[in-house]
Regions:
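Interdomain motor-coupling "hinge/lid" segment immediately C-terminal to the ATP-binding subdomain
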Residues: 1-141
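A structural signal for short, well-ordered beta-strand segments and their strand-loop junctions
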Residues: 8, 190-193
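Conserved aromatic-histidine-acidic binding/catalytic patches
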Residues: 5, 165-172, 249, 253
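A structural signal for well-ordered alpha-helical scaffolds and beta->alpha junctions
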Residues: 10, 174-177, 254, 258
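A cross-kingdom feature that marks ATP-driven nucleic-acid transaction machinery
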Residues: 185, 193-196, 200-363
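Short acidic, hydrophobic short linear motifs in intrinsically disordered regions
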Residues: 125-172
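Short amphipathic alpha-helical interaction segments
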Residues: 170-187, 191
Length: 363
């Protein structure tokens, strides 16, 4: 051939997924994880071919379709010659767990401590905190403070193939961490998103986005499954069990929606634009789009909710935050909340835009 064009197939954008499957439901995109196939997983049947459409199961997808497939690909590519420091992890069966740890980490940090410290579920801790602070009294509960967290964590670790340092056969080093990140980048499973700050000591740093949303969602499903095996939790009313389970999944869906919007906006942005998060001493804008030629910017809040709520735009109305933003990134031309409800413009000037329609318009 006189020429060849590389077509990247790992990542399927939301608009393409919606066009091919005829569904505009962003939650379906999150649950399918960017694949074009739906199915269900039986936790008890590790041999059944499946994806992660059913929230009562994820082990098969976690073990076969994500992390173990990554491990298998690394070990078979050119007879494993490119494994380098990961050879010992692969041979001991600990590479899958290492990858799962980084994916589960709230901030997706590629740090040695993430792999060495005793495992704690960030999804569990986040959900427990949110349920304790729930603004609606009828949904406020401290039930996750009263379950057997240790046994739930151990059950989750089994599902994710995660081992604590005492059970690890391989002495992990910074080289292992670096190469795991390097391979995930090569497989187009992660991307770096800039986080701009107003700190005098650090103007920006990188946040890691996982491009396949199912890599996180299936772990949240696994946590729900592990929680449902707890005796104290199972003695609760069906209504309360559903409330807690849905809160765990909703929390993760919200964080993944932010990642999806950020990554797809970054992918469609022009060379004259900068896209990232903007963090302040207190609070942040979920997304900033800066036009270098016009010296102007747009600021966004990204919410998974379908309903309008006044506090969704509180940072977009904060005069101090707006002044700091304008001082660094120029005139603010748009203040917008992306959510799953109908589009409208509020009397305070804040635009509300449907996130699914926003993603469909990106090119």
């Amino acid at each position: 051939y006189d020429r060849a064009k590389i077509i990247h197939t790992t990542f399927i954008p939301y608009r393409e997924h919606a066009r091919l499957l005829g569904s505009s439901d962003i939650d379906e995109y999150i649950r399918y994880g960017g694949t074009l196939r739906a199915g269900s997983i039986d936790f008890a049947n590790v041999d059944e071919q499946a994806s992660f459409y059913d929230d009562e199961s994820t082990r098969q997808y976690i073990d076969t379709a994500i992390c173990k497939n990554i491990q298998h690909g690394l070990t078979t590519f050119q007879a494993g010659n490119y494994l380098r420091h990961l050879q010992d992890l692969a041979e001991s069966g600990e590479l899958t767990g290492a990858i799962n740890r980084i994916i589960e980490d709230m901030n997706h940090r590629f740090l040695l401590s993430v792999l060495q410290n005793d495992f704690k579920s960030h999804d569990f801790g986040s959900a427990a905190q949110l349920l304790r602070r729930e603004s609606n009294p009828s949904k406020r509960t401290d039930i996750l403070d009263n379950v057997d967290r240790q046994s739930i964590t151990e059950r989750l670790m089994q599902l994710l193939d995660i081992k604590n340092k005492a059970q690890q056969k391989v002495n992990l080093t910074e080289a292992h961490v670096y190469e795991i990140k390097e391979y995930l980048e090569a497989l187009e499973l992660i991307a770096a998103c800039p986080v701009y700050t107003m700190s005098e000591r650090e103007s920006a740093y990188e946040y890691t986005i996982f491009i396949q949303p199912g890599m996180r969602y299936c772990q949240a499903q696994a946590l729900v499954y592990a929680l449902l095996q707890d005796k104290a939790f199972n003695n609760l009313s069906e209504k309360l069990k559903l409330l807690v389970s849905e809160r765990i999944l909703e929390d993760v869906r919200g964080r993944m929606l932010e990642d999806i919007v950020l990554f797809e906006t970054m992918q469609s942005s022009s060379k004259k634009q900068l896209v990232g998060k903007l963090k302040f001493a207190v609070g942040e804008y979920d997304m900033l789009i800066y036009d270098k030629e016009q010296d102007s910017c747009e600021v966004y809040e990204i919410k998974h909710s379908q309903q309008y709520a006044p506090n969704q735009c509180r940072y977009l109305l904060d005069e101090a935050m707006l002044a700091q933003t304008a001082g660094r990134f120029g005139r603010i031309t748009k203040r917008c909340v992306l959510y799953r409800g109908a589009a409208f413009k509020a009397s305070n000037g804040i635009e509300y835009e449907n996130v699914e329609e926003y993603l469909k318009k990106l090119k």
